Amino acid sequence: MTEKQVFKTTWGGRPLEVEIGQLAKQANGAVLVRYGDTVVLSAAVASKEAKDVDFFPLTVNYEEKMYAVGKIPGGFIKREGRPSERATLTARLIDRPIRPMFSEGFRNEVQITNIVMSVEQDCTPEMAAMFGSSLALAISDIPFDGPIAGVDVGRINGEYVLNPTVEQAEQTDIELTVAGTKEAINMVESGAKEVSEEDMLGALLFGFDAIKELVAFQEEIVAAVGKPKMDVDLLQVDADLKKEIFDAYYNTMKTAVMTEEKLAREVEIDKVKDTVKEVYAEKFSEHEEEAQLLKEVKQIAEDLEKDVVRELITIDKIRPDGRKLDEIRHLSSEVSILPRVHGSGLFTRGQTQALSVCTLAPLGEHQIIDGLGVQDSKRFIHHYNFPQFSVGSTGRAGSPGRREIGHGALGERALAQIIPSEEDFPYTIRLVAEVLESNGSSSQASICAGTLALMDAGVPIKAPVAGIAMGLVSDGENYTILTDIQGLEDHLGDMDFKVAGTKDGITALQMDIKIQGITEQILTEALDQAKKARMEILEELTTTIAAPREELSQYAPKIEMIQIKPAKIKDVIGKGGETINSIIDETGVKIDIDQDGNVSIASSDAEMIKKAIKIIEELTKEVEVGQVYLAKVVRIEKFGAFVNLIKGKDGLIHISQLANERVNNVEDVVKLGDEVLVKVTEIDKQGRVNVSRKALLNEENKEK
């Protein structure tokens, strides 16, 4: 039995402990990460043989176990089901910095599983899982060029904070996750409250310093317990064969690549590849290693396209569609595309097009987020759909995949910063982005279309937001940064760096790369170039619609907010919801009440809203000493009569307060059902109300 080994350090001021050798020993590599009281088991496994595929088959899973926070899953079967949106996003977050750290041509299937077993809310399980995933690979026999590490960075009052607590996260104006190796950053995910490029770069470098410490800690562990790496067969091609094909077809491929229109370009490129494969299929038809050689020919044909595109950009400074390196494709935008929806915006950038639709609903329609974190809700929701027809293909349709969930979340982060507060705009807001055409940067097109749809719907956003995707082609020593990358440049380039923001600053950032890291200089230049492009796109958006519409759509619900005392909530709701349901039945409105007494009344009929407000005001009206009421007698007792002052509140007229003269029998003065004028004379400590008819009679006599 392998002896358990424990390694300790601190991370963001909290203890970080790694256990190896006791759990999951049949995996190629496994570690138990303890970060404070957060515990994550990370295990990495690789197939023994390479798969016959033209991509690296890596899968990262992040499994949230409800027992980690002392909960039993809801629903009938009482067990965890499909991953939550947060789990899906976390799996993507871990995958992105790890994927570039495998050798090109490695085709063994690799699966990394992270099981969240215990959660302390202030010690993020996501970052513990990223750390564990890297370390499980690093100590295993799986070929891996890591380790990598990731950290969360916030900023409070101008000071950067490492791995903010739940309380600190509510105060921060930057929410950044950054990952990398000890040499360079290779993944970024961020939301921010309109911060400058300089401040965002500062946050990245602050996080990078912490990353280097975590990587050094992993290297110590690998030196102590790491396994020798397995020998694997990487797909390699014959150098002479590659030179022969490149010499024969380079110029033909260059002509094909420079076809301006996307679909036509794809046809021309495929023609060249097919020609290469056909010629060499015939040439090698009698060769004893025909299958292997044809596999190499297929790879060389792909390499030919890649090299042509990259050399065009880095050497000739020409892009496949003829644009300059910092040139944005043709822009166009429209609003009010759909007649019955609450708001819509269409944004087109070259051959990428997104239609965004805004729907407004009462606050009660907000989304509840119930997972391993603190239970929360959100009233702004952004969804992204990518149908296959957008790229001229057939394919799977149905529930969103990881990519769609990730792009939707990026758009939500970018736009959430400019959504008005609940007090200023008491609506739940849902944006749905339908990608209708795609040739790169569709997530950023959805952000631009979302801005248009919000303004068309009359949402009083703080400022318009635009997004742009930056690219990179690097040969190690030299690099070229591209503005507004199209699909081919994304596919064959080294970086996809998405930047969204207003004219005043960045609201969202996402970076993925295919190389093992990028420098501070590249980050700085990419951010500066992105800012220039963002301003150009914002000008297009505000030319189409300069400001949010002053009136909501006639089809949007009208919402009024009123405030009642929290103690009065029970009076509005009534026993078993009887009172509130009667108001809803009578008026047809939708009513939402929070624990602070904020009442939202929604309906398409403004008159019914007014009626509901009047009823609620009557229900919650306070009885005050000195007020006069026309009250109805509801009960007779020997000592006096009980009268109803307002709905839900009765008062007592003591027999001595019925008249100026002595009264022996209450019913000599009032009878059940009578209406009498009374004045409130006292409200005792128990809330009981005493009223007097006699006091009003005396006042009348004085006036006479």
Curated annotation (Swiss-Prot):
Top EC class of this enzyme: transferase
Location of this chain's protein in the cell: Cytoplasm
Domain of life: Bacteria
Residues the record lists as binding Mg(2+): D490, D496
GO-annotated biological processes: mRNA catabolic process; RNA processing
Keywords recorded for this protein, A-Z: Cytoplasm, Magnesium, Metal-binding, Nucleotidyltransferase, RNA-binding, Transferase
Residues of the S1 motif domain: 626-694
EC number: 2.7.7.8
Cofactor(s) named in the record: Mg(2+)
Reactions it catalyzes: RNA(n+1) + phosphate = RNA(n) + a ribonucleoside 5'-diphosphate
A Pfam family matched in the record: S1
Record-annotated KH domain positions: 557-616
Gene3D superfamilies assigned to the protein according to its UniProt record, in alphabetical order: GHMP Kinase, N-terminal domain, K Homology domain, type 1, Nucleic acid-binding proteins
A molecular function GO annotation: polyribonucleotide nucleotidyltransferase activity
InterPro entries: ExoRNase_PH_dom1 (IPR001247), ExoRNase_PH_dom2 (IPR015847), ExoRNase_PH_dom2_sf (IPR036345), KH_dom (IPR004087), KH_dom_type_1 (IPR004088), KH_dom_type_1_sf (IPR036612), NA-bd_OB-fold (IPR012340), PNPase (IPR012162)
Cellular component terms per the entry's GO annotation: cytosol
Keyword RNA-binding belongs to the record: yes
PANTHER family: POLYRIBONUCLEOTIDE NUCLEOTIDYLTRANSFERASE (PTHR11252), POLYRIBONUCLEOTIDE NUCLEOTIDYLTRANSFERASE 1, MITOCHONDRIAL (PTHR11252:SF0)
Family statement: Belongs to the polyribonucleotide nucleotidyltransferase family.
HAMAP family: PNPase (MF_01595)
Its biological purpose: Involved in mRNA degradation. Catalyzes the phosphorolysis of single-stranded polyribonucleotides processively in the 3'- to 5'-direction.
This protein's name: Polyribonucleotide nucleotidyltransferase
UniProt organism field: Enterococcus faecalis (strain ATCC 700802 / V583)
Gene symbol of the encoding locus: pnp
